[in-house]
């Protein structure tokens, strides 16, 4: 193991500054298979563009990490999401060319949402009933959360990685955001609500946590008008990966 880290350190020192984020991904976070990190790093050591770095990394990761809790996080650090195909048990890695993110300098809460929050209709807590939120999201029409993926998220929750922001009304779970935390980033993967305004209050609360510094960045996935209301803006995949990795480094 010591020789692996020594090799990685030597490779890192030989790369241009602009590509160091790539190795930081593997050196600091791909804790499952450090030997794979070495082979991926060597194959991308002389890229003609940063886009080739990402492409090479994705080929290495996609061919190495089978669908698993560890593989989900490892590939997420390369801008890849693990999704299920509705109505089947199959899983696939999905790559988006752009990601919508909410950051402290962009976060905003619409006035109507602030008014809903002030009514105190809902109790908002983290991860009181994670499986309840997981099941609520899975019941949504055309949900990509297949049974095998549910098991992976349950394992991520046991590992302390997956979490859910939940809304309760009179003690009953009425809404939730499902996701996981990587460094300073909260990856919002799915959500549901069973009563009016629960989803709105959850979004307002999540955005407030970004504004207050509890969360460094929210990954919204693909941009939607609803996300933009809370300050979400689009960045290229490469910039998104850089931001996630930098958040991991700062969290250490």
Model-derived features: positions:
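N-acyltransferase acceptor-side catalytic subdomain
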Residues: 1-252
């Amino acid at each position: 193991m010591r020789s692996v880290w020594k090799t990685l350190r030597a490779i890192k020192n030989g790369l241009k500054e602009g590509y160091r984020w790539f190795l930081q991904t593997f050196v600091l976070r791909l804790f499952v298979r450090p030997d794979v990190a070495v082979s991926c790093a060597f194959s991308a050591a002389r890229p003609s563009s940063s886009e080739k770095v990402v492409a090479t990394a994705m080929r290495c990761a996609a061919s190495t990490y089978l669908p698993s809790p560890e593989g989900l996080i490892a590939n997420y650090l390369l801008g890849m999401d693990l999704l299920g195909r509705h109505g089947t048990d199959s899983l696939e890695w999905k790559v988006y060319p752009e990601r919508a993110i909410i950051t402290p300098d962009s976060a905003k809460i619409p006035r109507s949402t602030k008014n809903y929050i002030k009514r105190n209709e809902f109790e908002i807590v983290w991860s009181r009933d994670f499986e309840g939120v997981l099941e609520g999201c899975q019941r949504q029409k055309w949900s990509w959360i297949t049974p095998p993926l549910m098991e992976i998220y349950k394992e991520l929750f046991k590992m302390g990685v997956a979490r859910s922001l939940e809304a309760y009304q009179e003690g009953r779970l009425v809404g939730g955001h499902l996701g996981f935390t990587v460094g300073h980033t909260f990856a919002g993967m799915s959500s549901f609500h069973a009563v009016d305004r629960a989803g709105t209050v959850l979004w307002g609360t999540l955005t407030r946590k970004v504004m207050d510094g509890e969360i460094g960045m929210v990954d919204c996935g693909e941009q939607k008008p609803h996300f933009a209301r809370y300050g979400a803006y689009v960045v290229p995949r490469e910039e998104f990966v850089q931001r996630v990795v930098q958040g991991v480094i700062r969290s250490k």
